[in-house]
Regions:
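Mature catalytic core of soluble alpha/beta enzymes
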Residues: 2-9, 18-317
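Short, linear, compositionally biased motifs with a strong N-terminal bias
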Residues: 14-15
C-alpha cells in the first residue's frame, strides 16, 4: 500500500437517487488522507438524516487521522514512534484496544504480521528508490528494532512502553480495514441497516443492495468475477502496487519481518490475495500475511488451517 495516510482531505458528494421523493438512497464519495472512498446507503433516508450521516463520516475519518495516521506528525501513533525506550506513555482507550487487536494478530501469525517493520521499510524504500539495496549489516542493525514483543501494553493504566527507542509502528497494513469497520459501526449506530463501505479497496457491507440482492464485489486481482458478500468484509493485498528492479531482482513494497527484506517477484511467488471475514481489520491483516508465503500452495494451506475464506493468485495462476 502506497502512503496510505497523509493529511486528511474530505469531500463528500451526496447523490439523491430518487430526487422527487422526500426520502432517498444516498451515495457519499470523496477522498480521505489521499485515499478515495465510496459509501452507499441502501436505506431510504431524509435530507436531515443524510446530513447527519455526512457529519458522522467526517468524524470517523478524523479519528483515524488523529489516532492511527503515522503520516500525521501530531497523531497518537506518531508520538509513540517518537518516544524513547522505557518511557511509559498514556494513550487513548481507542488506540489501546486497537493495539490489543494488533497484538492478537501478531501472535496468531507467529510474527508474520508485524507492524513494527517501519524502520526496515524506510531503509529499503530509500535504497530501492536510489537503485541500490542495503548491506546485510544495515538490515541486521535495523532488524534489532523490529518485533511487536518490544511493545508493552498496560491495560490497567492504559499505557504503552517501547523497549527499543528505534521501534516504530506502521499501521498501513491494518488501519484502513479498522476504519472501514468504524464506518460501518457509525452507520449502524445511526439506524442504517443496508450499506456498502469502501475505502482504498477495503470493503464491508451490511444488509442488501437497494434492488434487494446482496452486495456484489469484484476482487479483480485474484478472481475478476463478481461475488456476493453478505454483511461481511473483503480486503486484498498484492505485489502489483509498487516494485523496483535492482541487479536483475524485482522487489515489492512488502517487507517480510522474519528476513528483514522485501518480497521478490518470481514465477512461484504469491501475486495477490483476497480475504473475506466479518471484521475488515482482520481481513486486511490476513491479506497482507498471506502475501509472505513462498508459494500460492503454502499460502492456501496456512489460510485453510486458519479457516479463512480466500482467493489467492500465484505466479502460475
Amino acid at each position: 500500500m502506497v502512503k496510505l495516510f497523509k493529511k486528511i482531505s474530505l469531500l463528500i458528494v451526496v447523490l439523491f437517487i430518487s430526487g422527487c421523493t422526500k426520502k432517498s438512497f444516498l451515495i457519499y464519495e470523496g477522498v480521505a488522507m489521499t485515499i478515495p472512498y465510496k459509501i452507499i446507503i441502501g436505506d431510504l433516508i431524509d435530507k436531515k438524516s443524510g446530513q447527519l450521516i455526512s457529519k458522522k463520516i467526517n468524524e470517523t475519518f478524523s479519528i483515524t487521522d488523529r489516532i492511527f495516521n503515522n503520516w500525521n506528525p501530531n497523531s497518537e501513533i506518531s508520538f509513540i514512534n517518537q518516544a524513547s525506550e522505557n518511557l511509559e506513555l498514556s494513550i487513548s482507550l481507542t488506540l489501546f484496544e486497537f493495539l490489543e487487536e494488533v497484538e492478537t494478530v501478531f501472535l496468531l501469525t507467529k510474527g508474520l504480521f508485524d507492524p513494527t517493520i517501519l524502520p526496515l521499510k524506510d531503509l529499503w524504500l530509500s535504497k530501492l528508490k536510489e537503485g541500490s539495496v542495503p548491506s546485510e549489516e544495515e538490515v541486521q542493525m535495523y532488524k534489532e528494532a523490529v518485533g511487536f514483543e518490544k511493545i508493552r501494553l498496560n491495560k490497567q493504566n492504559l499505557t504503552i512502553t517501547k523497549s527499543n527507542s528505534n521501534t516504530r509502528i506502521d499501521l498501513c497494513g491494518i488501519a484502513k480495514g479498522h476504519t472501514v469497520d468504524l464506518l460501518i459501526k457509525t452507520l449502524k449506530d445511526n439506524r442504517i441497516c443496508n450499506a456498502y463501505v469502501e475505502w482504498g479497496g477495503e470493503i464491508k457491507t451490511i444488509g442488501k443492495h437497494p434492488i434487494g440482492r446482496y452486495w456484489q464485489v469484484i476482487p479483480i486481482k485474484t478472481l475478476n468475477t463478481p461475488i456476493e458478500i453478505n454483511s461481511c468484509a473483503i480486503a486484498s493485498s498484492g505485489n502489483y502496487e509498487q516494485e523496483w528492479t535492482v541487479e536483475n531482482k524485482t522487489y515489492t513494497h512488502i517487507i517480510h519481518p522474519k528476513t528483514g527484506c522485501p518480497l521478490e517477484i518470481n514465477e512461484k511467488s504469491v501475486q495477490a490475495t483476497t480475504v473475506l471475514h466479518e471484521k475488515c481489520l482482520y481481513a486486511d491483516a490476513m491479506a497482507t500475511t498471506l502475501m509472505l508465503f513462498p508459494s500460492k500452495e503454502e499460502s492456501q494451506l496456512w489460510a485453510e488451517c486458519q479457516g479463512l475464506t480466500t482467493y489467492i493468485k500465484g505466479g502460475d495462476s
